[in-house]
Amino acid sequence: MKTKRTRSSFRSMNSERKLESIFLFVTGKCNDKCAMCFYANDMAKKEKDLTFEEIRKISETAGEINKLWVSGGEPTLREDLPEIFEMFYRNNQIKDVNMPTNGLKPDRVIEWVKRFRTNCPDCN
């Protein structure tokens, strides 16, 4: 099966070297209409977001990763985002997380950053 062959190739590549970064588009949802957004024209398409299980499979097969970039739409609209961060920390030894946000949910971001700093202390 093509998928198994791809996963096998991906695993062997990662056994030899570490990925610098992975970019994860966690949601197509957004609570704003920013003029400069690269995704604004595609928001109306209502494509399905990756499930947590699909993201878990990515994490389990990716090997060690230096930086995790999460984007979207608006990443803070994804309720399971803290679990996604923690999973990549455990499975992939990420050292940095980068997440652009429109800043419309500051209390949620502050809560998540505190949780992340507690559960993933050596990650920025």
Positions of the model-derived regions?
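Conserved alpha-helical substructure of the radical SAM core
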Residues: K2-C123
